[in-house]
């Protein structure tokens, strides 16, 4: 099934880029690293340890929404990396594309801190992790398009959790479209 976007969301260091690229490869889908769409001034700020404001994030979120909409219009499937820390950010990403889903890579502070301390070459300093956890608005009950993925496992397990979530989302969409809950494959 095509024309859909799966947004890998979560704080910095949760594994969005690594897991997103692996799941995209497994499912022969496009992969878009949201960090590549940040305006240069945003990267400069974060590199200096300065958290981004909502105003800073808006042009970036609009670029990501454009990328998602393009996938939808081209009838393609893609995995897009975006922290999506606040509901208002997720709402921007949902605009115009009916098949946007979020895979929330969720883990505890200590696990993610340890991972960030081991990685090299990323512009996001470890010092900003606390501000990311503070900014995170945990998904609400009305956000039915978000699947929580427990990242306190190895990479293969987290990748498989994401792959299974995508397959379940697709199956649910087929069942809803057919309106046939009695169909065996929809049970």
From Swiss-Prot:
Q: Mind listing the UniProt keywords for this protein, alphabetically?
A: ATP-binding, Gluconate utilization, Kinase, Nucleotide-binding, Transferase
Any single biological process term in GO: D-gluconate metabolic process
The record, for InterPro entries, names:
P-loop_NTPase, Shikimate/glucono_kinase, Therm_gnt_kin
| Catalyzed reactions per annotation | D-gluconate + ATP = 6-phospho-D-gluconate + ADP + H(+)
Q: Give the signal peptide range.
A: none
Q: Does the keyword Transferase apply?
A: yes
Keyword Transferase on this protein?
yes
What pathway, per the record? Carbohydrate acid metabolism; L-idonate degradation
Provide the residue positions that the database annotates as binding ATP: 10-17
Q: What is its EC number?
A: 2.7.1.12
State the CDD domains in the record.
Answer: GntK
Identify a single GO molecular function assigned to this protein.
ATP binding
Q: Which PANTHER family match?
A: GLUCONOKINASE-RELATED
Give the family, as the similarity comment puts it.
Answer: Belongs to the gluconokinase GntK/GntV family.
Q: This chain belongs to which protein, by name?
A: Thermosensitive gluconokinase
Could you tell me which species this protein originates from?
A: Escherichia coli (strain K12)
The protein's gene is named idnK
């Amino acid at each position: 099934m095509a024309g859909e976007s799966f947004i890998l969301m979560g704080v910095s260091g949760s594994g969005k880029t690594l897991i997103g690229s692996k799941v995209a490869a497994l499912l022969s889908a496009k992969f878009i690293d949201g960090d590549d769409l940040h305006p240069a001034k945003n990267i400069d700020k974060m590199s200096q340890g300065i958290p981004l404001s909502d105003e800073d994030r808006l042009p970036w979120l609009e670029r990501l929404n454009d990328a998602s909409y393009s996938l939808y219009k081209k009838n393609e499937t893609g995995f897009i990396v975006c922290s999506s820390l606040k509901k208002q950010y997720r709402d921007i990403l949902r605009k115009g594309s009916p098949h946007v889903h979020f895979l929330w890579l969720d883990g505890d502070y200590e696990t993610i801190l340890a991972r960030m301390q081991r990685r090299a070459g990323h512009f996001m300093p470890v010092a900003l992790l606390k501000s990311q956890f503070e900014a995170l608005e945990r998904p609400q009950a009305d956000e039915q398009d978000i699947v929580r993925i427990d990242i306190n496992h190895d990479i293969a397990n987290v990748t498989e959790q994401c792959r299974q979530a995508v397959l379940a989302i697709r199956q649910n969409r087929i069942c809803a479209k057919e309106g046939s809950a009695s169909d065996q494959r929809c049970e």
